[in-house]
Design a protein with these regions (language model features):
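Short solvent-exposed strand/turn elements
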Residues: 286-321
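C-terminal hydrophobic structural anchor segments
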Residues: 329-366
Length: 407
């Protein structure tokens, strides 16, 4: 994601414009998780979009490759993946907004506390929505440098390209660093980007503290079943399976991990069938814990390249048996992913009804919009600050979940 400062205003009020810029800076400073991201939407794409709706990003089809001179053209299958459009806001009276004319006082008493609070709420939601969108998992009994190495290696096995970032709980990073802080290689650019949360580079990944990461508690052993619907060719041979994005079972919780006993393996982003096992991670569950959403799995039969696949199975295998990978207990959760796997865009949505005197500021790719509203009941004006954005991991192959036993 490009990092830059820019200001656009609908008024000539320099003071308001400067204030919004300070708030935008305070928000951007707290969003470490999305600093490593790429843009997937343009301002034009945001036109007419509403908060809470989803936007489709398309995963390109790499097609199939044949050896020799004979060509065998195949259809192009672009896969849609949803990115949610969201908004976070904070508001205050115009008196509170205008009370502090001195920029330093305004920064300390308004921009920084409100910007930080807004940003942390926003960041926590983005983290919770995306930390389990992974196709691989590394599970360990204790924090160690080996955990960081294993997670980076899992990505390397898929030959993913680009910058790799690692987000772990500060407690986890503290325990790892106690075993040899000198193992972290400092990087000037990353230090400037992530500030005090940056530890250094290890195993090819920038290591970053993230206090907003969740924990996962397994109270009762979860069980799960996955239903596969075959896709047939003209001769009734199974060449793949319809996309799967749900599982059923018992004691399901967000973050639960299941394996398929080596029967389900990853097709990497270049279309190569790898030997890396797919780990199925629960994204969300129904209240009873009997049905769960998972990252979409597009399965092809070995050598068939059906439906822009991200996973493959051997011919003749048409069922999968899932086994829980997590024992009963509580786990710290971390994530190692590529910068390119996270899409983040923040632009000015359509104006809200009844608003006026709008100012917009962008810092670090994060846009903050200020609007004023009349409060007819109390005969006063309100200042509202909005951060409209779209964020999401659009391809789970670019991310690895890390589970470290806490208790």
């Amino acid at each position: 994601m490009a990092f830059y400062n820019s200001v656009a205003t609908a008024t000539n009020d320099f003071t308001n414009n400067k204030k919004v810029l300070l708030v935008a800076g305070a928000v951007a400073d707290e969003l470490d998780y999305i600093k490593a991201s790429v843009s997937k939407m343009s301002q034009e794409d945001f036109k007419g979009k509403k908060y809470g709706k989803s936007y489709n990003i398309y995963i390109p089809d790499v097609g199939s490759v044949k050896e020799g001179l004979e060509a065998s053209p195949d259809d192009i299958t672009e896969v849609e993946t949803e990115i949610k459009l969201n908004n976070f806001n904070t508001s205050c009276t115009i008196d509170a907004w205008n009370e502090l004319g001195d920029m330093e006082s305004f920064k300390d008493q308004v921009a920084k506390p409100r910007g930080q609070h807004l940003a942390r709420q926003m960041a926590k939601t983005i983290v919770n929505d995306n930390v389990f969108k992974d196709m691989q998992a590394v599970i360990a009994d204790a924090p160690s440098f080996g955990v960081l190495s294993d997670a980076s290696a899992a990505l390397n096995e898929l030959a993913v390209g680009g910058e790799v970032v690692s987000f772990m709980h500060p407690t986890v990073m503290g325990k790892i660093a106690a075993g040899g802080l000198a193992n972290f290689i400092p990087g000037t650019e990353a230090k400037e980007l992530y500030g005090k949360n940056y530890l250094g580079q290890y195993a090819g990944a920038e290591q970053i503290n993230c206090a907003l990461l969740p924990t996962v508690t397994i109270k009762d052993a979860p069980t799960a079943t996955i239903a596969l619907t075959p896709v047939k060719d003209g001769e009734s041979n199974t060449i793949g399976f319809e996309t799967v994005d749900t599982i059923t079972g018992a004691n399901l919780v967000p973050g639960a991990v299941f394996t398929a006993g080596g029967a389900l393996k990853i097709v990497d982003q270049s279309g190569i069938e790898t030997e890396q096992d797919v780990q199925i991670i629960v994204l969300s569950v129904n209240p009873e814990g009997t049905s769960a959403k998972i990252s979409p799995i597009r399965i092809t039969v070995e050598g068939k390249n059906t439906g822009n696949p991200n996973a493959w199975m051997k011919a003749g295998v048409e069922t999968l048996t899932l086994t829980s990978a997590l024992a009963v207990g509580t786990y710290w959760v971390g994530q190692v992913r590529t910068k390119e796997s996270m899409a983040f865009d923040s632009f000015k949505f359509e104006n809200l009804p009844g608003s006026e005197n709008e100012d917009v500021a962008t810092v670090g790719g994060v846009t903050v919009k200020m609007s004023t509203y009349g409060d007819g009941t109390n005969l006063t004006k309100l200042i509202r600050l909005d951060v409209p954005h779209a964020a999401g991991i659009w391809d789970a192959r670019g991310a690895v979940a890390v589970y470290i036993k806490k208790s």
